[in-house]
Amino acid sequence: MDVIYNAIDVSKHQGKINWEAVKNAGVTHAMLRAGYGRYKNQVDPQFERNSAECERLGIQYGVYWYSYASTPAEARQEARCCLAAIQGKHLCLPVAYDIEYEPCILRLRPADGL
């Protein structure tokens, strides 16, 4: 059985989202950028609001962490920052690790396990 969700992917780049309008448009799921990088102050500025609005309106959500890691140690630090950012959240969808920054990808080796 195929399951299709009407979902969106959001971050600070979408600005202050009108989540009621999003829900009224039929969106049932969202992936929220929780943050990026390996410092705790790199939580997405809209993450708290976006997650609170999803919870308030019953929109199921998961999160992603945008990675700049180029070593396993950096990736572990990013994972710790992500876990700190999502503590206490009520995620219904997975935590995803977003690796698309080309300079970091080019430094990765298969042996790194990333």
Describe the role of every protein-language-model region.
Residues D2-L114:
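Substrate-binding cleft of extracellular glycoside hydrolase catalytic domains
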